UniProtKB/Swiss-Prot annotation:
Coiled-coil regions listed: none
Family matches, as Pfam families: GILT
Keyword Secreted in annotation: yes
Name by which UniProt lists this protein: GILT-like protein ZK669.3
Tagged with keyword Secreted: yes
Keywords: Glycoprotein, Secreted, Signal
GO terms for MF: oxidoreductase activity; oxidoreductase activity, acting on a sulfur group of donors, disulfide as acceptor
GO CC term, one of those recorded: extracellular region
Subcellular location: Secreted
Family from the record: Belongs to the GILT family.
InterPro entries: Interferon-induced_GILT
Glycan-bearing residues: 129, 185
Domain of life: Eukaryota
Length: 218
């Protein structure tokens, strides 16, 4: 009788394991992507326009991708002002980049969900200055007020939002020496800069969605 009970328990465990594997395969594992970039960096601008937006438009509907973007790059520092009541930042590509980064940080605060802020943040990316960005990036159904976003970007609050990104870099990407810097499930992959959509399909998204291109052997 004990032997029969043991066989029965093993059978139940085996069936449960198969059921779990099927459920996991049907739903797929979540892929967590975190990217860091600079507002006036041409490499960041190219990647956002030709890689992350197309990737999201093709794979976002799968519900298997989490994405976070942080407007903070290399050779960037933020320190408290002498009065300690403000923040002074110095950016890789000058003050215009700091302001663009601050504007992006304000947008992300106002629209914390990636799918809501990604189009606006991408629009801001690479613009000559925040005035040009504000002129074209807050039209349509963005749910954002142009004046309020500009005020935020040029305020102490906007500078603080931007400077807070430095702590995130220190925690998640202390070795960052390039922008854009892309982490997938906590690890940096340079291949994700070159063809994000293809790389995700080939290495991380299983089962493979029908939207994916033909697999490449790495």
């Amino acid at each position: 009788m004990r032997r029969l009970n043991g066989v029965f328990i093993c059978l139940i465990l085996f069936i449960t394991k198969i059921s779990y594997a099927k459920d996991k395969g049907a739903n797929g594992d979540m892929v967590n992507i975190v990217a860091f970039g600079e507002g006036r960096c041409s490499d960041t601008s190219y990647w956002m326009k030709w890689h992350w937006l197309p990737m999201w438009r093709m794979l976002g509907s799968t519900g298997r991708i989490n994405f976070d973007y942080h407007p903070y790059g290399i050779k960037t520092t933020c320190v408290d002002s002498e009065s300690a009541d403000d923040v002074v930042c110095d950016c890789h590509h000058g003050n215009r980049e700091c302001l663009l980064n601050q504007l992006q940080a304000c947008v992300i605060e106002a629209l914390p969900n990636f799918e809501d802020y990604m189009e606006v943040v991408t629009c801001i990316q690479g613009k000559q200055n925040i005035s040009m960005a504000a002129e074209v990036c807050f039209e349509g159904p963005t749910k954002l007020d142009r004046t309020k976003m500009m005020e935020c970007a040029e305020s102490r609050h906007g500078r603080k939002l931007f400077s807070d990104q430095e702590n995130i870099v220190a925690q998640m990407a202390p070795e960052m020496d390039w922008a854009p810097w892309i982490l997938i499930n906590g690890t940096r992959y340079k291949e994700a800069e070159e063809d994000l959509w293809q790389f995700l399909c080939d290495r991380f998204i299983d089962p493979r969605p029908i939207h994916c291109p033909k697999k490449i052997v790495y």
